[in-house]
């Protein structure tokens, strides 16, 4: 907004005073003293931090994540804890205000400064700004924070609720196999901290964030935010400035976007206020002239991720951030207006271009929010997402609203963020106290998060609507209609807040849900899993996950997956070697998935050979085979589990991708979203992750590079007509011209030479499409599939290989593993301190070729878990940090001999 000289003079005449002043920030991070409720446990801790980390650092407990310490340390969460420290103030001259500013308090705590109570916190997801002007003093001061046990607080509130309303609020407790705590739905704290089916229970207390005393003379420029909107051919940017001040004054704000040649300023009158806790929110709206049209920000794989520097100054105080320009639209029109029963679309447009969401689900990177390694872990994980061609990630609703750095880094990497509100797998209180607390939480976090370019949608919760309709819990004296009523009350109020704060970001009530259809049904659908609407979550461990026809055909699959085990190299950092057995006590207690001990075996040995040591046992009898549970077989079993996971995720993901722009006669299809569960881990255990706790890529993450490739070829055996079907997938926003598809059929006993080759030439493959190719390759009966390997390779007009797909037999146990190649590492070349090239050779087909490195490194191979169908391949190791390696540090194996 340009301000004329006349307007400026008008403001100058009437201002009381303009203060530039200077401010002092007193950082309260560092050493604090902590003690238990009865003072018998005490020591020196660190802020930012938490009680588990401090007890471990003080030598009072062992590493909480090792062995069975998650069971042995439950006494910590059942106690109250006190943290305190002293701090010195050396200059209070001309001070007009002082604030205690805490980014996050975990969770139920009372804060005292110089003996005076200044704050009672009740929400981990909120910052606190407390006026301490009249409490602090020159010289020595003290601050004390008394934390209540989160476990006991939640239990107390649940008991109070039941007495008042005559029913409990499900679920009362987590399943026993979680080894967790109860009633997390009564505390506004990360829900996973009470345990989940992929993680332990560590209900932390502490200050996991920055804590400061801000002393200012005049005004304090706390932060700024913005919203972008594209309308009538112009970009509009609304900036909001967050200022603390005392007394009436006039402030000059300046906004610069140097690369766009923009420099705007204005004066704002800040009215007098008696309370420094009242912020002054001031809004400046800018319309960017067309001669400075910004470059659009695009998701990974669709264009550049252009971000502009924004510099805002106020009274000599300067803050800088990054801003990107994109539009987002959630399309939910009817599939067929003449037949509305066919349902609605559900897909996103970025900058008016439809985008297929290819991604995964994000859980917190640690059980301990303040872990010093969390930033590096976050960046590595998001790098790993972008590296394999993903463009989207869903921040799951049982963890945290992530840090600003997370959303910035996602924007930098081109990762679209689907953001849940932090409500998951539970029903929640609808008392006015609880709802107002939740509204404040949602208002703050949606406002904070929505400024980041990567964010494309907010979802009200994870699976809560589905839980009601699926009758997940027994709830005495609490009918389904009452549950629906309470659910709608809470989430309609939260939706109203989110839509007001971030009007340009779509909002959906839940995930899974039926999108706009859910709203038309009053907020809760009769069937939230209806594939004709919205998104679905799909899990089924009693079907064949390697078959394309197993899967549903939804509009969007925002969760799906299957477990695998980390390799021995990861697990032995966190359990004793004597516990490296499938059903050892330590391993059993790390398997939190109900039924997972049995179903993992049933799924794996549906495809892979049962060890000879089990005799003639059938697949259903495998869990009773003692050899399966022995230390001798565990490493082999972990490898098999990763083989199974990689093919299951590949098959399901490519099933969804092949239905892009394609519908059945019933209207199913137009699938535009495939986001598997889950990316990462919070501990070393059997989970659904594709990157383990030590940041090692599992086989499935390497497979993701293939199944998420922008241009891909996908083959499967269609058993309805005994034909090999090949699909061409093009997620690029442009046509592919003069494409060649080569389909080879290899026999296991015929070395590397194909017994059949067909080649197909395609003039063009449209942008954003899935095209089927009739190969003419048939088989007379299902058992023939085990005799061959099918390789489909896509080449561009210059003959350069774009993508390769290998269809392995469904029943690999029918194949003679002795026919597999003898794979070797023939050479290792050091390119630089972070890069090594490996030469891999084989004499015959080498399925699921797996390279390992003895020395741990943070990074990845250019490929792994691949099927080697040529005599030689070059594989590159890319490390994030310097690592000294030689040939003897590497090993390679395949399905024949890995971990035998």
UniProtKB/Swiss-Prot annotation:
GO biological process: carbohydrate metabolic process; glycoprotein catabolic process
Reaction catalysed by this enzyme: Hydrolysis of terminal, non-reducing beta-D-mannose residues in beta-D-mannosides
Entry's family note: Belongs to the glycosyl hydrolase 2 family.
Annotated keywords: Glycoprotein, Glycosidase, Hydrolase, Lysosome, Signal
Record-linked InterPro entries: Beta-gal/glucu_dom_sf (IPR036156), Beta-mannosidase-like_N2 (IPR054593), Beta-mannosidase_GH2 (IPR050887), Beta-mannosidase_Ig (IPR041625), Galactose-bd-like_sf (IPR008979), Glyco_hydro_2_Ig-like (IPR006102), Glycoside_hydrolase_SF (IPR017853), Ig-like_fold (IPR013783)
Presence of keyword Ion transport: no
Pfam families given in the database record: Glyco_hydro_2 (PF00703), Glyco_hydro_2_N2 (PF22666), Ig_mannosidase (PF17753)
SUPFAM superfamilies listed in its UniProt record: (Trans)glycosidases, beta-Galactosidase/glucuronidase domain, Galactose-binding domain-like
Residues annotated as catalytic: 463 (proton donor)
Molecular functions per Gene Ontology: beta-mannosidase activity
Sites carrying sugar chains: 38, 42, 131, 477, 576, 661, 738
Chief location: other
Localization per record: Lysosome
Known EC number: 3.2.1.25
The keyword Coiled coil belongs to this UniProt entry's keyword annotation: no
Signal peptide, first to last residue: 1-21
Name of the protein this chain belongs to: Probable beta-mannosidase
Cellular component per GO, a single term: lysosome
EC primary class: hydrolase
């Amino acid at each position: 907004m340009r301000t004329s000289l006349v307007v400026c003079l008008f403001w100058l005449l009437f201002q009381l005073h303009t203060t530039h002043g200077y401010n002092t920030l007193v950082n309260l991070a560092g050493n604090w003293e902590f003690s238990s409720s009865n003072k018998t446990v005490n020591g020196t801790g660190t802020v930012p931090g938490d009680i588990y980390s401090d007890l471990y650092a003080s030598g009072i407990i062992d590493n909480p994540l090792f062995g069975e310490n998650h069971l042995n340390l439950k006494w910590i969460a059942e106690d109250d804890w006190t943290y305190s420290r002293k701090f010195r103030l050396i200059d209070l001259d001309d001070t007009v205000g002082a604030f205690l500013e805490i980014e996050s308090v975990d969770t139920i705590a009372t804060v005292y400064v110089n003996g005076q109570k200044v704050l009672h916190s009740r929400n981990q997801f909120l910052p606190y700004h407390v006026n301490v002007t009249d409490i602090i003093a020159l010289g020595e001061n003290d601050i004390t924070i008394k934390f209540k046990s989160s476990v006991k607080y939640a239990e107390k509130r649940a008991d109070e609720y039941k007495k008042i309303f005559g029913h409990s609020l499900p679920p009362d407790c987590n399943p026993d196999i979680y080894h967790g705590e109860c009633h997390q739905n009564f505390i506004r704290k990360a829900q996973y901290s009470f345990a989940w089916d992929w993680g332990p229970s560590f209900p932390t207390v502490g200050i996991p964030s920055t804590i400061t005393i801000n002393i200012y003379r005049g005004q304090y420029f706390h932060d700024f935010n913005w919203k972008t909107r594209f309308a009538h051919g112009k970009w509009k940017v609304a900036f909001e400035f967050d200022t603390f001040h005392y007394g009436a004054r006039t402030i000059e704000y300046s906004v610069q976007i140097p690369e766009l040649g923009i420099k705007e300023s204005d004066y704002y009158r800040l009215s007098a206020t008696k309370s420094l806790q009242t912020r002054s929110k001031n809004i400046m709206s800018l319309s960017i002239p067309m001669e400075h049209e910004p470059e659009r920000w695009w998701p990974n794989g669709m264009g550049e991720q252009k971000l502009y520097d924004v510099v805002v100054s106020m009274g000599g105080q300067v803050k800088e951030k990054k801003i990107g320009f994109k539009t987002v639209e959630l399309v939910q029109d009817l599939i067929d207006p003449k037949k509305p029963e066919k349902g609605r679309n559900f897909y996103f447009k970025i900058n008016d271009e439809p985008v297929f969401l290819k991604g995964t689900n994000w859980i917190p990177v640690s059980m301990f929010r303040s872990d010093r390694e969390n930033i590096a872990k976050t960046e590595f994980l998001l790098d790993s997402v972008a590296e394999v061609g993903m463009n989207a990630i869903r921040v799951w609703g049982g963890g945290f609203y992530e840090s600003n750095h997370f959303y910035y880094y996602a924007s930098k990497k081109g990762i679209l963020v689907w953001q849940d509100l932090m409500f998951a797998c539970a029903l929640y209180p609808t008392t006015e106290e609880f709802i107002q607390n939740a509204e404040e939480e949602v208002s703050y976090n949606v406002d904070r998060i929505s400024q980041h370019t990567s964010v494309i949608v907010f979802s009200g919760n994870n699976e809560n609507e589905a839980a009601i309709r699926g009758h997940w819990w027994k709830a005495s004296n609490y009918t389904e209609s009452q549950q629906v009523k309470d659910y709608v009350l809470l989430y309609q109020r939260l939706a109203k807040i989110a839509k007001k704060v971030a009007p340009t970001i779509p909002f959906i009530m839940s995930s899974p849900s039926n999108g706009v259809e859910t709203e038309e049904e009053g907020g809760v659908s009769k069937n939230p899993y209806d594939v004709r609407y919205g998104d679905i979550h799909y899990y089924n461990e009693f079907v064949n996950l390697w078959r394309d026809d197993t899967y549903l055909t939804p509009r969007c699959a925002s969760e799906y997956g299957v477990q695998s085990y980390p390799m021995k190299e990861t697990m032995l950092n966190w359990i004793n070697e004597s516990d490296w057995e499938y059903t050892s006590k330590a391993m059993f207690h790390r398997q939190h998935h109900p039924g997972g001990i049995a179903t993992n075996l049933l799924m794996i040995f549906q495809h892979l050979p049962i060890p000879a040591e089990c005799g003639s046992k059938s697949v259903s009898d495998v869990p009773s085979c003692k050899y399966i549970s022995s230390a001798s077989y565990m490493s082999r079993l972990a490898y098999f589990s990763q083989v199974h996971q990689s093919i299951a995720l590949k098959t399901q993901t490519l099933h969804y991708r092949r239905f892009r722009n394609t519908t059945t006669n019933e209207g199913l299809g137009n699938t535009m979203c495939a986001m598997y569960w889950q990316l990462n881990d919070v501990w070393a255990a059997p989970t659904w992750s594709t990157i383990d706790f030590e940041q090692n890529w599992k086989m499935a993450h390497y497979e993701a590079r293939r199944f998420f490739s922008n241009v891909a070829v996908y083959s499967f055996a269609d058993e309805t007509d005994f034909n090999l079907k090949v699909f061409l997938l093009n997620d690029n926003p442009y046509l592919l011209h003069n494409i060649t598809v080569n389909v080879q059929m290899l026999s296991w006993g015929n070395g590397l030479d194909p017994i059949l080759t067909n080649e197909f030439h395609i003039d063009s493959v449209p942008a954003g499409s899935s095209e089927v190719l009739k190969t003419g390759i048939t088989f007379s009966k299902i058992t023939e599939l085990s005799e061959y390997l099918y390789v489909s390779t896509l080449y561009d007009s210059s003959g350069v290989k774009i993508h390769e797909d290998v269809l392995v037999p469904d029943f690999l146990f029918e194949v003679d593993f002795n026919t597999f190649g003898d794979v070797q590492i023939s050479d290792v070349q050091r390119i630089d301190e972070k890069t090594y090239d490996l030469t891999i050779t084989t004499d015959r087909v080498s399925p699921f070729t797996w390279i390992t490195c003895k020395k741990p490194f943070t990074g990845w191979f250019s490929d792994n878990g691949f099927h080697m169908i040529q005599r030689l391949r070059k594989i590159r190791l890319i490390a994030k940090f310097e690592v000294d390696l030689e040939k003897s540090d590497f090993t390679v194996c395949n399905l024949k001999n890995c971990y035998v």
